[in-house]
Amino acid sequence: MELCGLGLPRPPMLLALLLATLLAAMLALLTQVALVVQVAEAARAPSVSAKPGPALWPLPLLVKMTPNLLHLAPENFYISHSPNSTAGPSCTLLEEAFRRYHGYIFGFYKWHHEPAEFQAKTQVQQLLVSITLQSECDAFPNISSDESYTLLVKEPVAVLKANRVWGALRGLETFSQLVYQDSYGTFTINESTIIDSPRFSHRGILIDTSRHYLPVKIILKTLDAMAFNKFNVLHWHIVDDQSFPYQSITFPELSNKGSYSLSHVYTPNDVRMVIEYARLRGIRVLPEFDTPGHTLSWGKGQKDLLTPCYSRQNKLDSFGPINPTLNTTYSFLTTFFKEISEVFPDQFIHLGGDEVEFKCWESNPKIQDFMRQKGFGTDFKKLESFYIQKVLDIIATINKGSIVWQEVFDDKAKLAPGTIVEVWKDSAYPEELSRVTASGFPVILSAPWYLDLISYGQDWRKYYKVEPLDFGGTQKQKQLFIGGEACLWGEYVDATNLTPRLWPRASAVGERLWSSKDVRDMDDAYDRLTRHRCRMVERGIAAQPLYAGYCNHENM
């Protein structure tokens, strides 16, 4: 019987209606799930605005901050030398720092003409800087430079005291971070007392200028950001297999033939500029010339330096590491490193020594003969150690110290006392730290801080959570741990992405190496780092965001 006139849906129409209803329910459920995920993520890392107030990074050793607010007027505030300071107007390093930090404090904001009721507020009119010992104004920073300082902020004069200029530079950065604008646009600072010094003496950033050439202006920008985060070592991995951009005075063919192009080189003037720019910010420039591996670009401009590699048919088919059997190798290296010691004033040279591939040496009959003559048998680690020992002796004769990657220690090279070992292999690095320090060698750590290994999300947290001294050993061993480095290797990094890939991720490493072991509060770190990141952006550093949020300066 046909039901006419009732308007009931036919079976196909009913099925379509049911499917539509089911689809709508599923979409609603998925929306709810997505909302729950978003809420959970927001709860884990809340969206933080750039709220007013100081955000110190890295956190000083001791901070006593009162609620008493003082004000600064850009046109009526000066940074100058204390009358009893051992440094004075002739100290170019401090004079330039005074101008620089006045600009950091006031120059990146729209100056605000304050309403009349705010003109009479208590003001800080001057920051007096006092160096109490020999200033070292014209010196270069070194591994034992004193970076301690005290800062007393009160009206009408704030006082910054440091034993050396290096501590004054760190204190100026802290003072600049204390200043903020209130809701009226007034430059404000809390009455404060700060006593500060770094936990570790070596706090480095590694840049790689071989895989990709980095223009000098990018290196200088990196040095600025390092100063904002109180890093004090630029580890300059300047050459590698891919290119040789260092323009040697003695061996110009190294860069003429080994660089990507003649415009992709660092001239002597470029190198001097980087070193002086770093010095004015209290930063050492540590050059790395990695041998005997990672040297293919060297061979293009230096004949007979590299080892010929042979196929199974005894045919020459490529070149490998530096040839460790020839006297000419060591004559070249002696002359080359003498030049490096004169160009780079730092007391250390990083000699590399990592990832040496033995297959080429194994294929070369002359290398095999040399091994037999020396009694090395077939243990190519002994040949590697033979080479490393020769290079270490060269460095010692030019009165420089050596830093090496951990393989040099692992492969039983005879290291001179005081040789610094850099631990970079992420697997079981605490055990490696224990072994190196048990043998009496100073150590620096980079294994957990390879910033080229990127991941989506807030990976700064894992860098921040590392406790460098969390390895087995005596107190004497722990004292041999002198610091660490955040490394940004250059296979996938050039001038377009170096800065946002470094910052603020490297900032997490900076606080871990400067601040007390007890500074561990992740929520507080997130709040401070979010605002510190905004401050870096205001100062011209293209630091990537930590999470959802905003910076106050974005609408200025």
Curated annotation (Swiss-Prot):
* Primary residence: other
| Taxonomic source organism | Homo sapiens (Human)
Please state the pathology the record ties to this protein: GM2-gangliosidosis 2: An autosomal recessive lysosomal storage disease marked by the accumulation of GM2 gangliosides in the neuronal cells. Clinically indistinguishable from GM2-gangliosidosis type 1, presenting startle reactions, early blindness, progressive motor and mental deterioration, macrocephaly and cherry-red spots on the macula.
Q: Which cysteines are joined by disulfide bonds?
A: 91-137, 309-360, 534-551
> Per its UniProt record, what PANTHER family does this chain match?
BETA-HEXOSAMINIDASE (PTHR22600), BETA-HEXOSAMINIDASE SUBUNIT BETA (PTHR22600:SF38)
Q: Please report the PTM annotation for this entry.
A: N-linked glycans at Asn-142 and Asn-190 consist of Man(3)-GlcNAc(2) and Man(5 to 7)-GlcNAc(2), respectively. The beta-A and beta-B chains are produced by proteolytic processing of the precursor beta chain.
What is this protein's name? Beta-hexosaminidase subunit beta
> In the record, which residues are listed under signal peptide?
1-42
What Enzyme Commission number(s) apply to this enzyme? 3.2.1.52
